[in-house]
C-alpha cells in the first residue's frame, strides 16, 4: 500500500486464488463473502478486500487477468513492466485442493475453464466490474 501511495517504480504481480491454500484452506483477505473455508465453515462473513480500489486510489497502474486468459495476462504484465511508477497486476488463479472442491469443481481444469465464462475483457474503462479483466492506467 505504501509503494502505491508513493508511486514507487516497482511492479507487483499477485497470483490471487482467494484462499490460503498451502496451509489447509483458510479464509484470506480476498475470499468471497459466504465462501466456506477451513476457518469459516459456515461461510465467510467479511467482504473481500477491493485490491483494485486500493491501487487505483493513488492513480497507479492496475491490471487484472486470469490463468485462463493467458495472452491477456502476458499483456498486463508487459504493460506493467513498461509503466513508470507503481504497477500492480492481479491474476486470478485456481486452488482446486482447498477451494475448488468445496465449491463443487471436479478438477483444476474445470475450475480454470469457469474463468472463461465468468470473466470478460474490458479494454475501455476506468473501473473494472467484479467479472471483468483489463487494465487501468
Predicted regions and their residues:
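Generic secondary-structure signature for well-ordered alpha-helical cores
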Residues: 5-8, 18, 56-60, 78-85, ...
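Short, hinge-like loop/turn segments at secondary-structure boundaries
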Residues: 3, 28-32, 105-108
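Glycine-rich beta-alpha junction loops
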Residues: 17-19, 69, 92-98
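Short beta-strand segments
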Residues: 11-16, 90-92, 136
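Flexible, low-complexity linker and terminal segments
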Residues: 92-137
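Thiamine diphosphate
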Residues: 1-21, 72-75
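Glycine-rich, charge-decorated loop segments at or immediately adjacent to ligand/cofactor-binding or catalytic sites
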Residues: 21-28
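Conserved thiamine diphosphate
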Residues: 28-83
Amino acid at each position: 500500500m505504501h509503494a502505491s501511495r508513493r508511486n514507487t517504480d516497482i511492479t507487483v504481480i499477485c497470483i490471487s486464488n482467494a484462499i490460503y491454500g498451502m496451509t489447509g484452506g483458510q479464509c484470506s483477505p480476498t475470499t468471497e463473502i459466504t465462501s466456506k473455508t477451513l476457518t469459516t465453515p459456515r461461510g465467510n462473513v467479511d467482504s473481500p478486500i477491493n485490491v483494485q480500489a486500493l491501487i487505483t486510489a493513488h492513480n497507479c497502474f492496475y491490471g487484472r487477468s486470469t490463468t485462463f486468459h493467458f495472452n491477456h495476462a502476458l499483456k498486463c504484465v508487459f504493460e506493467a513492466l513498461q509503466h513508470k511508477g507503481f504497477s500492480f497486476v492481479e491474476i486470478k488463479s485456481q486452488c482446486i485442493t482447498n477451494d475448488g472442491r468445496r465449491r463443487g469443481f471436479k478438477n483444476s481444469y474445470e475450475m480454470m475453464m469457469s474463468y472463461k465464462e465468468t470473466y470478460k475483457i474490458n479494454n475501455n474503462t476506468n473501473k473494472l466490474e467484479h467479472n471483468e479483466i483489463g487494465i487501468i492506467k
